């Protein structure tokens, strides 16, 4: 295996790790409620706030990523994760825990953006498709493994175990990135974000699609956040098992992506969208009623 391939796999694992950070502690939300003795709303707010900050970082950093030192930016992101993970693991104060978790989101937002940019630069024209496919596999695996890993660690060592685990992994990755050669992305070679023309902001189709995407992900993450509490309070399912029950949701998302590739070759995109939205609404209502 060449040094270039090793770098590609390291970058892919960095993207996996960033997604792991985001999803790993969702299964222990009921336990956090007991640990910190604060309203469940504030526990859930750390989940929503984390995702919001990650999204903002993509917008803020995406415009200038090409002109920055890639290695320094990656080390900065990992450094933020190290500091915040240490504080989250050590503190018993919810305010400090929440601030550190939201601070962690900044590092989590930096890592995947830089890794994607570097993957596009380091891979050759012939190998770029394979590199992007591997990147997508890493991203797809994280939401599937994170709840299981989080519930396993959380059941035994609570949130301290989860953030200690993140601390150790982030330190190892920091040292690896520090000692390997990471090239800079030359300005203008890779452009991840295109300027959105003003006409799109008043286009009804564009606004409709963005709104639909927002509502779908709002529902998706609402269910993810609510599921641990539902399983614990209604069905008396412990943290150790609840993480496994996240797996069907993640697998369904992956299968949906695979099915779309096949369906798009046979059916019109608008028809697929209509059927998908209708089915999503029906099954969401069934989830609430049943």
Map each language-model feature to its residues.
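Helix-breaking motifs and short loop linkers at transmembrane-helix boundaries and internal kinks
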Residues: 37, 69, 90-96, 236, ...
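Conserved MFS/SLC helix-loop-helix module at the cytosolic interface between two early adjacent transmembrane helices
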Residues: 56-92
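Helix-to-loop junctions at the C-terminal end of transmembrane segments
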Residues: 59-69, 256-268
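Paired small-residue
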Residues: 84, 95-103
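Cytoplasmic helix-loop-helix junction between adjacent transmembrane helices
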Residues: 100-138
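Helix-loop-helix hairpin linking two adjacent transmembrane segments in secondary transporters
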Residues: 133-178
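Juxtamembrane intracellular "pre-TM" segments in multi-pass secondary transporters
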Residues: 182-209
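Extracytoplasmic gate region of multi-pass secondary transporters
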Residues: 208-246
């Amino acid at each position: 295996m060449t040094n270039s391939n090793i770098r590609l796999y390291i970058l892919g694992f960095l993207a996996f790790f960033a997604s792991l950070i985001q999803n790993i502690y969702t299964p222990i939300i009921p336990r956090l409620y007991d640990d910190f003795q604060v309203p469940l709303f504030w526990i859930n707010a750390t989940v929503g706030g984390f995702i919001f900050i990650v999204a903002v970082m993509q917008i803020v950093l995406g415009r200038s990523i090409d002109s920055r030192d890639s290695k320094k930016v990656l080390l900065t992101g990992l450094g933020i994760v190290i500091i915040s993970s240490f504080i989250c693991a050590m503190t018993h104060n919810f305010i400090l825990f929440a601030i550190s978790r939201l601070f962690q989101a900044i590092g989590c937002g930096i890592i995947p953006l830089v890794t994607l940019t570097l993957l596009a630069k380091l891979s050759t024209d012939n190998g770029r498709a394979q590199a992007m496919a591997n990147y997508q596999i890493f991203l797809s695996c994280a939401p599937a493994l994170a709840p299981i890993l989080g519930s396993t660690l959380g059941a035994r060592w609570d949130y301290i175990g989860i953030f200690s685990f993140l601390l150790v992994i982030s330190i190892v990755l920091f040292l690896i990135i520090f000692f390997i050669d990471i090239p800079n992305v030359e300005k203008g070679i890779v452009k991840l974000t295109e300027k959105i023309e003003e006409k799109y902001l008043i286009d009804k189709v564009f606004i409709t699609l963005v709104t639909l995407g927002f509502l779908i992900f709002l529902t998706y993450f609402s269910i993810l956040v609510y599921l641990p509490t539902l399983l614990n309070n209604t069905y008396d399912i412990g943290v150790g098992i609840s993480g496994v029950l996240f797996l069907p949701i993640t697998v369904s998302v992956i299968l949906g992506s695979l099915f779309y590739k096949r369906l798009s070759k046979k059916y019109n995109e608008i028809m697929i969208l209509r059927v998908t939205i209708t089915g999503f609404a029906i099954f969401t209502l069934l989830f609430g009623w049943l």
